[in-house]
């Protein structure tokens, strides 16, 4: 058995025996690692609260037969502290942790870009400069991009025709609190098309999750959503990190953006992200 050192974000923990825990960590150099923290649940544990979710830790581990064992842990930054008293930020953070684990199915497969995205997302939540749901959606979109699943937002996802809808500007779209606009599209991005003049489907574009993003009129599949032009502009801004544009977006476009992003990420994961249910009810 060999010793190795790495740093990582604690994603989750689960009980093992009477005093131990299995800790799932997204590390900088070794990808996702599952390791045992011996005696963590004891009152006088030498690890204290260092192996709790949201904590960035520097670790010394040795390789075990099935699970590695944590022999030393030092806190680099406890991202959970500023989130614990802010429910919207906490729920967005838990959705990030769950997503990070879902996008790292293989253990000990280095994925430093996913690690850095998670660190940046948690830092942004803790700094409380931006709307936590915007931070979450930016994280989800960039995580998709790193994994090779970025939605097509500038051209048709099917035929590649460049998008011209973004120059039209946007007016009121009447989106309701459930993320549905006048086209009746729900969180899964599907519904009857009754697009107004400010909506993508009113010109040449719609958004279809199964197709991979925007679709032109010729490639539009049944049930495609007709989001507001400003909603697609917001998605573009979040994907490229344009916070000046994202921060001035209107609430109804943020709701619609979140619905599309949630549907898109869960489609590509082929698995629901349970934490998103709590975010949607904030």
Predicted features by range, described:
Residues 1-282:
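Non-catalytic alpha-helical scaffolds and adjoining flexible linkers that form interface surfaces
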């Amino acid at each position: 058995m060999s010793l190795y050192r790495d740093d990582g974000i604690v994603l989750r923990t689960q009980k093992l025996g009477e005093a131990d825990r299995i800790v799932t960590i997204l590390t900088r150099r070794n990808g996702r690692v599952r390791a045992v923290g011996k005696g963590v649940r004891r009152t006088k544990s030498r690890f204290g609260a260092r192996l709790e979710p949201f904590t960035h830790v520097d670790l010394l581990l040795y390789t075990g037969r099935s699970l590695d064992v944590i022999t030393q842990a030092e806190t680099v930054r406890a991202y959970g502290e500023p989130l614990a008293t802010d429910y919207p930020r906490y729920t967005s953070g838990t959705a990030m942790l769950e997503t990070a684990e879902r996008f790292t199915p293989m253990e000990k497969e280095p994925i430093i870009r996913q690690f850095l995205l998670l660190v940046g997302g948690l830092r942004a939540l803790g700094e409380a400069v931006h709307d936590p749901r915007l931070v979450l959606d930016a994280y989800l979109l960039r995580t998709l991009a790193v994994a090779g699943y970025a939605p097509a937002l500038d051209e048709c996802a099917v035929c590649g025709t460049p998008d011209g809808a973004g120059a039209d500007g946007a007016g009121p779209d009447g989106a309701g609190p459930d993320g549905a606009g006048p086209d009746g599209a729900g969180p899964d991005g599907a519904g009857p098309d009754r697009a107004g003049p400010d909506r993508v489907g009113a010109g040449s574009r719609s958004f279809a999750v199964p197709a991979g993003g925007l679709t032109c009129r010729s490639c539009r599949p049944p049930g495609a959503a007709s989001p507001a032009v400003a909603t697609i502009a917001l998605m573009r801004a979040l994907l490229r990190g344009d916070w000046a544009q994202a921060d001035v977006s209107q609430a109804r476009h943020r709701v619609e953006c979140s619905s599309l992003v949630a549907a898109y990420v869960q489609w590509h994961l082929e698995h629901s992200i349970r934490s998103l249910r709590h975010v949607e009810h904030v």
